[in-house]
Swiss-Prot record:
<keyword id="KW-0479">Metal-binding</keyword>
<comment type="function">
    <text>Involved in the biosynthesis of isopentenyl diphosphate (IPP) and dimethylallyl diphosphate (DMAPP), two major building blocks of isoprenoid compounds. Catalyzes the conversion of 4-diphosphocytidyl-2-C-methyl-D-erythritol 2-phosphate (CDP-ME2P) to 2-C-methyl-D-erythritol 2,4-cyclodiphosphate (ME-CPP) with a corresponding release of cytidine 5-monophosphate (CMP).</text>
</comment>
<feature type="binding site">
    <location>
        <begin position="63"/>
        <end position="67"/>
    </location>
    <ligand>
        <name>4-CDP-2-C-methyl-D-erythritol 2-phosphate</name>
    </ligand>
</feature>
<feature type="binding site">
    <location>
        <position position="9"/>
    </location>
    <ligand>
        <name>a divalent metal cation</name>
    </ligand>
</feature>
<feature type="site" description="Transition state stabilizer">
    <location>
        <position position="36"/>
    </location>
</feature>
<dbReference type="GO" id="GO:0019288">
    <property type="term" value="P:isopentenyl diphosphate biosynthetic process, methylerythritol 4-phosphate pathway"/>
</dbReference>
<comment type="pathway">
    <text>Isoprenoid biosynthesis; isopentenyl diphosphate biosynthesis via DXP pathway; isopentenyl diphosphate from 1-deoxy-D-xylulose 5-phosphate: step 4/6.</text>
</comment>
<feature type="binding site">
    <location>
        <position position="144"/>
    </location>
    <ligand>
        <name>4-CDP-2-C-methyl-D-erythritol 2-phosphate</name>
    </ligand>
</feature>
<keyword id="KW-0456">Lyase</keyword>
<feature type="binding site">
    <location>
        <position position="44"/>
    </location>
    <ligand>
        <name>a divalent metal cation</name>
    </ligand>
</feature>
<dbReference type="GO" id="GO:0046872">
    <property type="term" value="F:metal ion binding"/>
</dbReference>
<dbReference type="InterPro" id="IPR003526">
    <property type="entry name" value="MECDP_synthase"/>
</dbReference>
<feature type="binding site">
    <location>
        <begin position="58"/>
        <end position="60"/>
    </location>
    <ligand>
        <name>4-CDP-2-C-methyl-D-erythritol 2-phosphate</name>
    </ligand>
</feature>
<keyword id="KW-0414">Isoprene biosynthesis</keyword>
<dbReference type="InterPro" id="IPR020555">
    <property type="entry name" value="MECDP_synthase_CS"/>
</dbReference>
<dbReference type="GO" id="GO:0008685">
    <property type="term" value="F:2-C-methyl-D-erythritol 2,4-cyclodiphosphate synthase activity"/>
</dbReference>
<protein>
    <recommendedName>
        <fullName>2-C-methyl-D-erythritol 2,4-cyclodiphosphate synthase</fullName>
        <ecNumber>4.6.1.12</ecNumber>
    </recommendedName>
</protein>
Length: 163
Protein backbone atom coordinates (compact mmCIF):
# COMPACT_ATOMS: atom_id res chain seq x y z
CA UNK A 1 0.00 0.00 0.00
CA UNK A 2 1.18 3.53 -0.69
CA UNK A 3 0.09 6.79 0.89
CA UNK A 4 0.86 10.42 0.30
CA UNK A 5 1.04 13.28 2.77
CA UNK A 6 1.53 16.99 2.43
CA UNK A 7 3.20 19.31 4.89
CA UNK A 8 3.55 23.04 5.34
CA UNK A 9 5.53 25.34 7.60
CA UNK A 10 6.34 29.02 7.89
CA UNK A 11 8.62 31.13 10.06
CA UNK A 12 9.06 34.87 10.16
CA UNK A 13 12.35 36.70 10.04
CA UNK A 14 13.21 38.26 13.39
CA UNK A 15 16.01 40.75 13.63
CA UNK A 16 19.62 40.57 12.66
CA UNK A 17 21.42 37.29 12.59
CA UNK A 18 23.94 35.18 10.79
CA UNK A 19 21.45 33.15 8.80
CA UNK A 20 19.28 30.10 9.31
CA UNK A 21 19.01 26.37 8.64
CA UNK A 22 17.10 25.10 5.65
CA UNK A 23 16.95 21.47 4.58
CA UNK A 24 19.61 20.72 7.18
CA UNK A 25 22.00 23.25 5.63
CA UNK A 26 23.30 26.53 7.06
CA UNK A 27 22.23 29.42 4.82
CA UNK A 28 24.07 32.69 5.46
CA UNK A 29 21.83 35.74 5.63
CA UNK A 30 21.65 39.01 7.52
CA UNK A 31 18.48 37.90 9.33
CA UNK A 32 17.53 34.92 11.46
CA UNK A 33 14.25 33.02 11.63
CA UNK A 34 12.07 33.24 14.73
CA UNK A 35 11.29 29.74 15.96
CA UNK A 36 11.03 27.55 19.03
CA UNK A 37 13.27 24.91 17.40
CA UNK A 38 16.01 25.63 14.86
CA UNK A 39 13.32 26.94 12.48
CA UNK A 40 14.13 24.72 9.49
CA UNK A 41 10.90 25.26 7.55
CA UNK A 42 11.76 22.71 4.87
CA UNK A 43 12.46 19.87 7.28
CA UNK A 44 9.39 20.86 9.30
CA UNK A 45 7.22 20.64 6.18
CA UNK A 46 8.76 17.27 5.29
CA UNK A 47 8.21 15.99 8.84
CA UNK A 48 4.62 17.24 8.74
CA UNK A 49 4.05 15.53 5.38
CA UNK A 50 5.54 12.27 6.65
CA UNK A 51 3.23 12.33 9.67
CA UNK A 52 0.28 13.03 7.39
CA UNK A 53 1.13 10.18 5.03
CA UNK A 54 1.29 7.80 7.99
CA UNK A 55 -1.99 9.09 9.44
CA UNK A 56 -0.23 10.30 12.59
CA UNK A 57 -1.43 13.87 12.88
CA UNK A 58 0.91 16.80 12.44
CA UNK A 59 4.22 18.17 13.63
CA UNK A 60 2.59 20.41 16.24
CA UNK A 61 0.98 17.40 17.91
CA UNK A 62 4.28 15.53 18.21
CA UNK A 63 6.63 18.47 18.83
CA UNK A 64 4.52 21.32 20.31
CA UNK A 65 6.17 24.73 20.32
CA UNK A 66 5.17 25.32 23.93
CA UNK A 67 7.10 22.26 25.15
CA UNK A 68 10.57 23.17 26.50
CA UNK A 69 11.94 19.80 25.34
CA UNK A 70 11.87 21.09 21.76
CA UNK A 71 13.51 24.47 22.48
CA UNK A 72 16.29 24.95 19.88
CA UNK A 73 15.72 21.37 18.69
CA UNK A 74 17.64 20.19 15.65
CA UNK A 75 15.09 19.56 12.89
CA UNK A 76 17.08 16.60 11.58
CA UNK A 77 16.54 15.04 15.01
CA UNK A 78 12.80 15.76 14.83
CA UNK A 79 12.70 14.13 11.39
CA UNK A 80 14.67 11.13 12.70
CA UNK A 81 12.19 10.69 15.57
CA UNK A 82 9.33 10.85 13.08
CA UNK A 83 10.99 8.29 10.81
CA UNK A 84 11.23 5.92 13.80
CA UNK A 85 7.51 6.42 14.54
CA UNK A 86 6.70 5.75 10.88
CA UNK A 87 8.82 2.58 10.85
CA UNK A 88 7.16 1.34 14.06
CA UNK A 89 3.80 1.81 12.34
CA UNK A 90 5.01 -0.10 9.27
CA UNK A 91 5.76 2.78 6.87
CA UNK A 92 8.90 3.68 4.95
CA UNK A 93 9.42 6.84 2.88
CA UNK A 94 9.76 6.44 -0.87
CA UNK A 95 10.26 9.99 -2.08
CA UNK A 96 9.96 13.63 -1.08
CA UNK A 97 9.26 16.78 -3.08
CA UNK A 98 9.71 20.07 -1.24
CA UNK A 99 9.24 23.69 -2.26
CA UNK A 100 10.65 26.67 -0.37
CA UNK A 101 8.99 30.06 -0.92
CA UNK A 102 11.27 33.01 -0.17
CA UNK A 103 11.95 36.34 -1.83
CA UNK A 104 15.46 36.35 -0.41
CA UNK A 105 18.08 35.07 -0.05
CA UNK A 106 18.64 33.28 -3.32
CA UNK A 107 18.63 29.59 -2.47
CA UNK A 108 19.84 27.99 -5.72
CA UNK A 109 23.44 27.60 -4.45
CA UNK A 110 22.19 25.49 -1.51
CA UNK A 111 19.66 23.22 -3.23
CA UNK A 112 22.09 20.36 -3.89
CA UNK A 113 23.30 20.32 -0.29
CA UNK A 114 19.69 20.43 0.97
CA UNK A 115 18.78 17.46 -1.21
CA UNK A 116 21.78 15.50 0.03
CA UNK A 117 21.24 16.36 3.71
CA UNK A 118 17.56 15.44 3.49
CA UNK A 119 18.31 12.22 1.61
CA UNK A 120 20.93 11.27 4.22
CA UNK A 121 18.54 12.01 7.09
CA UNK A 122 15.79 9.92 5.48
CA UNK A 123 18.10 7.15 4.23
CA UNK A 124 16.95 7.78 0.66
CA UNK A 125 18.96 8.18 -2.51
CA UNK A 126 19.39 11.84 -3.52
CA UNK A 127 17.31 11.04 -6.60
CA UNK A 128 14.33 10.32 -4.33
CA UNK A 129 14.49 13.81 -2.83
CA UNK A 130 13.65 16.94 -4.77
CA UNK A 131 13.95 20.48 -3.42
CA UNK A 132 12.82 23.57 -5.29
CA UNK A 133 12.92 27.24 -4.40
CA UNK A 134 10.67 29.96 -5.72
CA UNK A 135 9.52 33.45 -4.89
CA UNK A 136 5.97 34.72 -4.54
CA UNK A 137 6.68 37.53 -7.01
CA UNK A 138 6.86 40.08 -4.17
CA UNK A 139 3.32 39.22 -3.04
CA UNK A 140 2.33 38.40 0.54
CA UNK A 141 4.56 38.05 3.58
CA UNK A 142 7.24 36.04 1.75
CA UNK A 143 7.26 38.55 -1.09
CA UNK A 144 7.77 41.40 1.37
CA UNK A 145 10.71 39.50 2.87
CA UNK A 146 8.98 38.99 6.22
CA UNK A 147 9.58 35.24 6.35
CA UNK A 148 9.97 31.93 4.58
CA UNK A 149 7.44 29.19 3.85
CA UNK A 150 7.86 25.61 2.71
CA UNK A 151 5.59 22.85 1.56
CA UNK A 152 6.36 19.22 0.94
CA UNK A 153 4.78 16.07 -0.40
CA UNK A 154 5.95 12.75 1.01
CA UNK A 155 5.19 9.32 -0.44
CA UNK A 156 5.37 6.30 1.87
CA UNK A 157 4.78 2.60 1.34
CA UNK A 158 4.09 -0.31 3.64
CA UNK A 159 7.30 -1.75 5.01
CA UNK A 160 8.18 -5.15 3.49
CA UNK A 161 6.12 -7.85 5.17
CA UNK A 162 3.70 -5.31 6.69
CA UNK A 163 1.03 -5.05 4.10
Amino acid sequence: MIRIGQGFDVHRFAGKGEGFRLGGVAVPYHKRLEAHSDGDVLLHAITDGLLGACGMGDIGRHFPDDDPRWRDADSIGLLASTLRLAAEAGWVPVNVDGTVIAQAPKLAPYIGAMRQATADAMELSPGAVNVKATTSERLGFTGRGEGIAAMAVVLVESAPGRG
